[in-house]
Amino acid sequence: MVKKLTGKSFALSALVAASFVAAGAMASDKTEPRNDVYKDKFSKQYNSWHATAESEAITDALEQDPALVILWAGYGFAKDYNAPRGHMYALTDVRNTLRTGAPTSAEDGPMPMACWSCKSPDVPRLIEEQGESGYFTGKWAKGGAEVANTIGCSDCHEKGTPKLRLSRPFASRAMEAIGTPFDKASKQDKESMVCAQCHVEYYFEKTDDRKGFVKFPWDGGTTVENMEVYYDAIQFADWTHAVSKTPMLKAQHPGYETWKLGTHGQNNVSCVDCHMPKVTNEQGKKFTDHKVGNPFDRFEETCGTCHSQDKEHMLTVYKDNKSKVMELKSKAEAQLVAAHFEAGAAWKAGATEDEMKPILTNIRHAQWRWDYAIASHGVSAHAPAEALRVLGTAVDKAANARVQLAQLLATKGVKQPIELPDISTKAKAQAALGMDMDKMNADKAKFKQEMLPKWEADAKAREATYK
């Protein structure tokens, strides 16, 4: 049956339809999300950016270090955590990870829209079209058909030009909060600020008026202590630990913050200087290499422009620093894993919230500091001394928590030491937490088979209307 439209309802329907056509008729005035649009005009940069696809190998960080499963018990990272890959894989990896779940509709799934925020130039497009409230409202799956282009040109550049920009309003606010507004920064500083839109610590706000918004916790500064004080003051927790019941903080990837504290940051050596150097192609044309990667892979164009030592010497220095960081990282993890299980035993023995509060605070602070150091993937090069300092405080605070727990458990008549489960592999650690990995993997496979093709088809149809 066809319902007859009145003149008023017909006009309204036409207006709504026209608004959708107009919205899809072109990319945003400020943001062109399609990277391919620039492959001819900026071919050298485009081709080198596309070469980030050469990092196709997937490294399972949980398999390499099963203790991580316990440290993140009750949080998405205990399900799945792989080492980062090149920019070409940003969308692929966030779609494929178990952390984003297996939504069956736009209103389904465990994660919010904010999880797209560092993955695509479609994000600034959506914010420009919908406003931040419109963009951040809803589940991650809501953006499935909208966020279709991986990290690329418009994330860092003004539309159609090489001019740098901050494309995310939350990044602009963060820079202003620490007294370094982007529009007043030098070109050298801007080359790091554009990276700091994503390679930073951030969290998703939980207040009613800004629920799910991305914010950098920099109001009091950018050190690990500054951010710890900030989070404690607003009583923020990313999740409650499944074993110890600690209100936990999950560090993201504070590369910018740790870089600022190291030799390179202190001497104003930018991210671009080391990770996107000027190179000369076969035609003798000089350009900025957009294959963001390890400086040692292009030593002469990166390290060699400042350091007089040869590559072998510099690699030895780096490996020595990394070895020290990894050794202290392992010590912190061992203390924290034990502390979580001992806290769990204390709760089972009848410990009260008042008895546990100072213990859980030590665990919270210890793991935050450990995570801050290790989640900044390049910290062994950027700021090894700061990494060792922070990890040292993590070990101390975790050890303090264990001393407190030993005393408390003794008063409860609990036999010590507390027996720990076998967590020698990722699978055993996940089983110890009662995680049904078979179901999670099956659900994800179904999502990839049924939802992803629809997202891609819808995105293709939408972009076909762009001018």
From Swiss-Prot:
Enzyme class: oxidoreductase
Known function: Catalyzes the reduction of nitrite to ammonia, consuming six electrons in the process.
Reactions accelerated catalytically: 6 Fe(III)-[cytochrome c] + NH4(+) + 2 H2O = 6 Fe(II)-[cytochrome c] + nitrite + 8 H(+)
Signal sequence region: 1-27
Binding site for heme c 3: 87, 195, 198-199
Name of the featured protein: Cytochrome c-552
Biological pathway: Nitrogen metabolism; nitrate reduction (assimilation)
Gene from which this protein is expressed: nrfA
EC number: 1.7.2.2
